[in-house]
């Protein structure tokens, strides 16, 4: 398929630069199969969830992964931690006039010292000195890495608003943004209705913002991210399927974790590992029936994913409606509910 199949015109004014004033007050476009598009608010989500349905949330936590400093040689350097390997070692993207060489010392804000010990592809392996762990150093001295389309520096409000209320495990450099709409009160309402909540972990990498640079999407190479599906979640999903209930993925990262864990057999299995799953039209979904997601960038892999899930024509119509009604787009924007379109030609 051609990348141009996933292009659309988006007015710049619709790119949300800040979160809504109140968490959970975003708009919700309900775009389920076989029903007209509905303009709702996010607090109406329980109206579409049945007792016994399972909602799967990604409990990753965004690291303050951006560090500023200088090389021992004096040149400025910026590091974006992509993955923590152990308590004192991490892989990072480096921005500098000249790339550091193995053995070169680096000094970041707060007096953090590190040595560049090697490379893995485009990533630099940094070994941090001192008694504190990488996570502790980042929490004390790092900066939250907002997406590139948010044209401002992160502030104190982002420290809380760019995290979900259920975030647990540090490791992401971008938020699972569909989850940003959920409040503790909404989670209680869903449980009161009889919905089951379950969790996965997928540490969202910086690659989620990388553009597709090929004309034919089949030639695109997906980035790899670490994920885990606990046994409790696999059991909850299997039980829901047996009851005839629906499985909801809260966000594309939850969907990618679930579908990755079902890749081998077609049934969800507990486990962990790296995934580079690339979901495009023609993919056969094994687990997810409903998806809560934000609005995605033109020509992005996530737009391809939702097109695979609900059908390209359906997504085009929904996005055209969203632009006309001036929904807010991307990480701090509004949300939509999608259903698996069984009529999609696969």
From Swiss-Prot:
Record-linked SUPFAM superfamilies: QueA-like
Compartmental location: Cytoplasm
Catalytic activity: 7-aminomethyl-7-carbaguanosine(34) in tRNA + S-adenosyl-L-methionine = epoxyqueuosine(34) in tRNA + adenine + L-methionine + 2 H(+)
Assigned GO CC terms: cytoplasm
Enzyme class: transferase
Principal subcellular localization: cytoplasm
Enzyme Commission identifier(s): 2.4.99.17
GO MF assignments: S-adenosylmethionine:tRNA ribosyltransferase-isomerase activity
Superkingdom of this protein's organism: Bacteria
Pathway: tRNA modification; tRNA-queuosine biosynthesis
Keywords carried by this UniProt record: Cytoplasm, Queuosine biosynthesis, S-adenosyl-L-methionine, Transferase
Keyword Transferase applies: yes
PANTHER family the UniProt entry points to: S-ADENOSYLMETHIONINE:TRNA RIBOSYLTRANSFERASE-ISOMERASE
Self-association state and partner proteins as the record states: Monomer.
Family: Belongs to the QueA family.
NCBIfam families tied to this protein: PRK00147.1 (NF001140), queA (TIGR00113)
Protein name (record): S-adenosylmethionine:tRNA ribosyltransferase-isomerase
Native species: Neisseria meningitidis serogroup C (strain 053442)
């Amino acid at each position: 398929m051609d990348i141009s199949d996933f292009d659309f015109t988006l007015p710049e004014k619709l790119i949300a630069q800040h979160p809504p004033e109140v968490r959970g007050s975003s708009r919700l476009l309900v775009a389920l199969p076989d029903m007209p598009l509905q303009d709702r608010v996010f607090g109406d989500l329980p109206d579409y969830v049945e007792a016994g349905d399972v909602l799967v949330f990604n409990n990753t936590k965004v690291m303050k992964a951006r560090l500023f400093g200088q090389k021992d040689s004096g040149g400025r350097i910026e590091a974006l931690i992509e993955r923590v390997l152990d308590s004192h070692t991490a892989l990072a993207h480096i921005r500098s006039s000249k790339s550091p060489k193995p053995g070169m010392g680096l000094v970041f804000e707060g007096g953090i010292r590190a040595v560049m010990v090697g490379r893995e592809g485009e990533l630099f392996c940094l070994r941090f000195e001192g008694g504190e762990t990488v996570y502790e150093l980042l929490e004390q001295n790092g900066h939250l890495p907002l997406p590139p389309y948010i044209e401002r520096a992160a502030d104190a409000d982002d420290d809380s608003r760019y995290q979900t209320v259920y975030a647990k495990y540090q490791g992401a450099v971008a938020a699972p943004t569909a989850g940003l709409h959920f409040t503790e009160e909404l989670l209680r309402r869903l449980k009161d209705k009889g919905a089951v909540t379950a969790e996965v972990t997928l540490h969202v990498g910086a690659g989620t913002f990388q553009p597709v640079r090929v004309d034919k999407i089949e030639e695109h190479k997906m980035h790899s991210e670490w994920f885990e599906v606990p046994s409790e979640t696999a059991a909850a999903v299997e039980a829901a399927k047996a009851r005839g209930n629906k499985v909801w993925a809260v966000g594309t990262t939850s969907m990618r974790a679930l579908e990755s864990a079902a890749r081998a057999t077609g049934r969800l299995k507990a486990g962990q590992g790296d995934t580079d799953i690339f979901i495009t039209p023609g993919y056969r979904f094994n687990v997810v029936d409903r998806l809560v997601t934000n609005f995605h960038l033109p020509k992005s892999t996530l737009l391809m994913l939702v097109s695979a899930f609900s059908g390209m024509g359906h997504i085009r119509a929904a996005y055209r409606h969203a632009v006309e009604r001036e929904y807010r787009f991307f990480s701090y924007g509004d949300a939509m509910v999608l259903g698996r379109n069984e009529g999609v030609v696969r």
